[in-house]
Amino acid sequence: MSKVGTGDSKNTLYCSFCGKSQHEVRKLIAGPTVFICDECVELCMDIIREENKSSLVKSRDGIPTPKEICKVLDDYVIGQGHAKKVLSVAVHNHYKRLNHQTKHNDVELAKSNILLIGPTGSGKTLLAQTLARILDVPFTMADATTLTEAGYVGEDVENIILKLLQSADYNVERAQRGIVYIDEIDKISRKSDNPSITRDVSGEGVQQALLKIMEGTVASVPPQGGRKHPQQEFLQVDTTNILFICGGAFSGLEKIISARGRTTSIGFAAQVLAPEDRRTGEIFRHVEPEDLLKYGLIPEFVGRLPVVATLEDLDEASLKKILTDPKNALVKQYQRLFEMENIELTFADEALGAIARKAIERKTGARGLRSILESILLETMFDLPGLEGVEEVVISREVVEGTARPLYIYADRSDRASETSASA
């Protein structure tokens, strides 16, 4: 175990595993009753690493197909078929890349980071959140609006890798195979065409900082709980195999695309549509890298996002489905709230259409549906806990339009409170 020998060597310490003396190794670590040398520690780490790799290969043998991923997305996200296909294929290929790199070393497969462009409330963030539910790799979301260059007030880009590491329970091997979604990426566009006016610490500066981690670098991340000791070493995370998905509304990009379209077709045969005559999602379909450069993204940043997926505007039919079809649909959520009061909440089909039209008029997409429902049901939710005998509340189109109040149906059918008089 510990001390062996006679004479001068009686105080010499030996490794309990390989038997080498303290003079033959760089360091000898003492336990309660044993010693282990640095060489045996490294050997143990190599064994653990190999076992982790083999377990990763086994876990990725059943790679989910793009159709399987898309099917799960369909359960939560209505419409956006093209964007779902792009994301499903990208995630599937991400799994395949990791599997290929673990097993083979002949051809290096480069990753294809993704840029999601779509109007407000079209489902970009929801797609990313739903992916987080179904993936077997660590996943994190970051907000680009909070990022600044290192050294300035705000979060620096290394914080993104720290969040990914936290989602992997500080397992560096797993974090290096994760997926990062960066929201509001359009907010870090260059603020001015003249870079010499002021230092753009939250725009072009952040783009430059993101370039490194998106392309692949070794980021230094503080260990769990932060650095409590000055000599405590940072964790090194290689970002080469981390897939980055960036999303943004890119408000105003449609004008740049439309302007380019007008300059390319002139003459009597040219068909020119004003931007307001076409839906934003339809215009986004024609986006080119040069449009993103004019918007304020630097060429190097655009080059690191080779896959561009555009999302469509949500029409009335899609918004109605969003209200009722997904597993966590808004109507189902409010019906559950009313069930807690033992009351049934019913929406007429015309009422759902009126709610969808309101969201379209406000140009808020699916994100605006909750605020519309809140305003419609506010008075009802305020009154109901104090009322007795109500078993059903019916919401009609007139209620949504503000010309009537909800219909309360009481348990005693002879006493039906039909509060459908016009509101003052």
Swiss-Prot record:
PANTHER family: ATP-DEPENDENT CLP PROTEASE ATP-BINDING SUBUNIT CLPX-LIKE, MITOCHONDRIAL, ATP-DEPENDENT CLP PROTEASE ATP-BINDING SUBUNIT CLPX-LIKE, MITOCHONDRIAL-RELATED
Binding-site list for Zn(2+): C15, C18, C37, C40
Keyword Metal-binding: yes
Protein name: ATP-dependent Clp protease ATP-binding subunit ClpX
Cited NCBIfam families: clpX (TIGR00382), PRK05342.1 (NF003745)
GO biological process: cell division; proteolysis involved in protein catabolic process
GO molecular function: ATP binding; ATP hydrolysis activity; ATP-dependent protein folding chaperone; protein dimerization activity; unfolded protein binding; zinc ion binding
Assembly and oligomerization: Component of the ClpX-ClpP complex. Forms a hexameric ring that, in the presence of ATP, binds to fourteen ClpP subunits assembled into a disk-like structure with a central cavity, resembling the structure of eukaryotic proteasomes.
The organism's place on the tree of life at top rank: Bacteria
InterPro entries tied to this protein: AAA+_ATPase, ATP-dep_Clp_protease_ClpX, ATPase_AAA_core, Clp_ATPase_C, Clp_protease_ATP-bd_su_ClpX, ClpX_bact, P-loop_NTPase, Znf_CppX_C4
Keywords of this entry: ATP-binding, Chaperone, Metal-binding, Nucleotide-binding, Zinc
Organism annotation: Nitrobacter hamburgensis (strain DSM 10229 / NCIMB 13809 / X14)
Gene Ontology cellular component terms for the protein in this record: HslUV protease complex
Stated role: ATP-dependent specificity component of the Clp protease. It directs the protease to specific substrates. Can perform chaperone functions in the absence of ClpP.
